[in-house]
Amino acid sequence: MAIVANTFTSFDAKGIRESLANVIANISPDEVPLQSNIGSESVSNTFFEWQTDSLASVDKTAVIDGDDVTSFDSTAATVRIGNYTHISRRTLIVADNLNAQDLAGRNDEKAYQMAKRGRELRRDIEAVLTDNNARAAGNSSTARETAGLGAWIATNTNKAGDGTDPTANDGSDARNDGTQRDLTEAMVKDVMQQAFTSGGNPSILMVGPHNKTVVSGFAGIAAQRYMAPSDSPTTIIGAADVYMSDFGTLQVVPNRFQRERDAWLLDPEYASVCYLRPINSVDLAKTGDADKAMMLAEYGLKVSNEAAHGGVFDLNVT
């Protein structure tokens, strides 16, 4: 049906205000499972150290009645190990005239962008801590680097035939990746048994998104069903968030920022993020018609005793 001639419509009008929602939708992931589950502490040097120790092997030798002590057990010294701090930062520069304008979804552009940088920085830190990266002392032209999980876990592992564990298990060298293969329940059981034998009690199985779905399909996980009344919606459970092994219960945690090819079995009590400088915002010198700032943190990974943890490595990523 045609409109009456000379009807003035919204297609002709020039003064209609735009309709822009006062909400900004951002679903970028920012969960950081490793940082959320392990502790944090402060350090006072770019190289921070700690000590590890272990008990002597079990001795079943019987002692004769009234026997004198003529020899003594050997005493092993503690092992001193350490890691370097790692500086991560995010920067921004925002023109001054932005705050003179009517902005949708935020009142202050710089504050909004700084909040974003903080979330981005936490994601960066998560990727560094879970990486297969050896520690580096750095110098005036090369940045220091902290050793990630991949450079620490060496005692309790399951890897491909051509993969190798870090030789020093002190963060000074990274593992060598091998041929990728499918994650299986037997691999997880193997590492849990190794950790138990070593004295560890991992409670978290941290995997990438693909291998989270693989864990949910383990044959050892019993099918779960709810009774479905005819007049109610039915819930179908297709995921595993807890895995009960012969040597303890594991909380299955997906991590978007770790390497998909690694599966970590962790005891949160034996790892922490050490901060020389915690995450903080710094306003930079103003040199023009704009505000400059950065969000910065200096931190390192402390693995109190790597034998408390384990890993399944060289996994397929799709």
Walk through the language-model features, giving the residues of each.
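Flexible, glycine/threonine- and acidic-rich loop/arm segments that mediate assembly and lattice contacts
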Residues: M1-T318
